[in-house]
Curated annotation (Swiss-Prot):
Assigned protein family: Belongs to the archaeal riboflavin kinase family.
HAMAP family reported in the protein's UniProt record: Riboflavin_kinase
Protein name, as recorded: Riboflavin kinase
Chain's gene name: ribK
InterPro entries documented for this protein: RibK_CTP-dep, Riboflavin_kinase_archaeal, Riboflavin_kinase_CTP-dep, Riboflavin_kinase_dom_sf
Residues reported in the UniProt entry to bind CDP: 10-15, 106-109
Chain positions recorded as FMN binding sites: 93, 101
Top-rank EC class of the record's enzyme: transferase
Native source organism of the sequence: Methanobrevibacter smithii (strain ATCC 35061 / DSM 861 / OCM 144 / PS)
Lineage: Archaea, Methanobacteriati, Methanobacteriota, Methanomada group, Methanobacteria
Length: 124
């Protein structure tokens, strides 16, 4: 599935969670990279929500961390046909349903010169 979406500013909470060893070590082991401590937030059209929710609900990749932290489902993905990473689905989130959170080894706003309002494609 390939979806175009719009880059938006997140809440800034992912940096803390993606700095925790149990998340970092799991992503490194299972996705092949140490994630940059932050996500690229992408708003996708609501028409894709049924397919996204199906993927999320059927996802078997899950990190179950220490007590006090939420579980995270993830699927490997590509951004703009050039960056390999993953989409994360945190069990505890305050984002709307049509937000995708993309992680990669680099700070994607800098690497791809992205700003709020830019269009990106996410494939998973």
């Amino acid at each position: 599935m390939k979806i175009d979406g719009t880059v938006t500013t997140g809440l800034g909470k992912a940096a803390y969670f993606l700095s925790q060893d149990f998340y970092v070590n799991n992503f490194k082991k299972n996705c092949g990279f140490r994630p940059y401590p932050g996500t690229l937030n992408v708003i996708v059209p609501e028409e894709y929500l049924p397919q996204i929710n199906k993927v999320k609900n059927e996802c078997k990749n899950i990190i179950k961390p220490d007590e006090g932290f939420g579980a995270v489902k993830y699927i490997k993905a590509r951004l703009n046909d050039e960056v390999t990473g993953a989409i994360v689905f945190p069990a505890k989130t305050t984002h709307e349903e049509n937000y995708l959170e993309f992680i990669a080894k680099d700070k994607l706003r800098d690497k791809l010169n992205l700003e709020d309002g830019d269009t990106v494609s996410v494939e998973f």
